[in-house]
Regions:
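Feature marks short, highly hydrophobic, charge-poor N-terminal signal-anchor/signal peptide-like helices
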Residues: 1-11
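Beta-strand-turn-beta hairpins that frame and shape the catalytic cleft
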Residues: 36-47, 147-158, 204, 277-282
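Active-site-proximal loop/helix segment associated with metal-binding centers of metalloenzymes
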Residues: 153-249
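Active-site neighborhood of phospho(di)ester-bond hydrolases with catalytic His/Asp-centered motifs
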Residues: 48-50, 74-79, 104-111, 143-144, ...
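Conserved beta-sheet core of the metallophosphoesterase superfamily
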Residues: 95, 103-107, 122-126, 214-297
Length: 297
């Protein structure tokens, strides 16, 4: 009940400031560009949340309580799970979620295949940048790393991907894993070049993981350690437990960027925690308006 009241107040107070930015279809075969404008004269509302891993119950409740519209946009900071199994289960989930009355703007995480590798995605213009989309699911977009998007008049740079802390378990047990889960050198160069063109100034950063100096160390008990403690608490805690070999190169690179760019707010997911450290906002379960007055303080 309390959450419902909060969401209603959020919708009234923080309803957004600009009309929906619309989008254009870009044919992969060089055809004419068709423009589809959702603008009906009322402002779109922009929201943001963290990893979902195929669990969208909160999003469904949010859409129902807030009475969202297709023009409203929910940014998800990676690991949505839409391209996790690479089979019909993914299509079933996309079909179910595409029926929600909202547009999803998704970052690539590390627990899913990249859209460009799936083979069913085209490219479309959206809010000043390019996005991946599937014609069958026209309200589910994936951001392209290194693109700059304009939401409610404010520019955001997007960088997806991270290292999977359970990589060894995935490989041992045959669970889904992708070698290109982290941003590569080409992506990093593209991001740095775009930021330099903007004189290293951007309103916000949208990334899956966070800069190295902001790691939420309290979340770093390994997956195996957690599982062992749940099975046999005393025995597990008395032993020297498994410590994963974690590649922090993405976080280190983001840390270098964070030190040299001028930004107002930085949103990230990945760590399954709702927490703010300085201008870094980590998102998980919370669904909040993209812009709050205190973000500009």
């Amino acid at each position: 009940m309390c959450n419902s009241i909060i969401f209603i107040l959020m919708g009234v107070i923080f309803g957004g400031s600009l009309a929906f930015c619309g989008y254009s279809h870009i044919s992969k075969h060089g055809g004419k560009t068709a423009t589809f404008d959702y603008d009906d004269g009322t402002p779109a509302r922009f929201y943001i949340t963290g990893d979902k891993h195929r669990h969208f119950e909160r999003v469904k409740d949010f859409c129902r309580v807030m009475q969202t519209r297709r023009k409203d946009v929910l940014i998800i900071l990676g690991d949505e799970g839409f391209n996790y199994y690479d089979d019909k289960r993914d299509d079933e989930l996309k079909k179910e979620i595409s029926e929600l009355n909202i547009t999803l703007f998704c970052l690539h995480g590390n627990k899913e295949n990249r859209p460009q590798n799936v083979g069913t995605y085209g490219i479309r213009s959206f809010c000043g940048g390019k996005v991946y989309y599937e014609p069958k699911y026209p309200n589910i977009y994936f951001a392209i790393d290194g693109e700059i998007y304009t939401f409610e008049g404010k520019k955001y740079m997007v960088v997806g991907g991270a290292h999977s802390v359970d990589k060894l378990r995935c490989l041992e047990e045959g669970l889904p894993y992708w070698d290109d889960e982290m941003p590569g050198d080409e992506t990093k160069m593209s991001v740095e070049t775009r930021l330099e063109r903007n004189e290293n100034g951007i309103y916000g950063m949208l990334t899956h993981t966070c800069p190295i100096d902001y790691l939420p160390t309290e979340m770093f008990m390994s997956t195996r350690q957690n599982a062992a403690i749940k099975r046999k608490p005393r025995k597990a805690k008395s032993k020297k437990l498994f410590k994963p070999d974690i590649d922090r190169s993405t976080e280190i690179w983001l840390g270098e960027l964070e030190k040299k760019i001028d930004y107002k707010i930085w949103f990230c997911g990945h760590y399954h925690v709702d927490k703010q450290i300085d201008k870094i906002r980590m998102m998980h379960k919370e669904i909040r308006p993209l812009h709050l007055p205190e973000d500009d303080d």
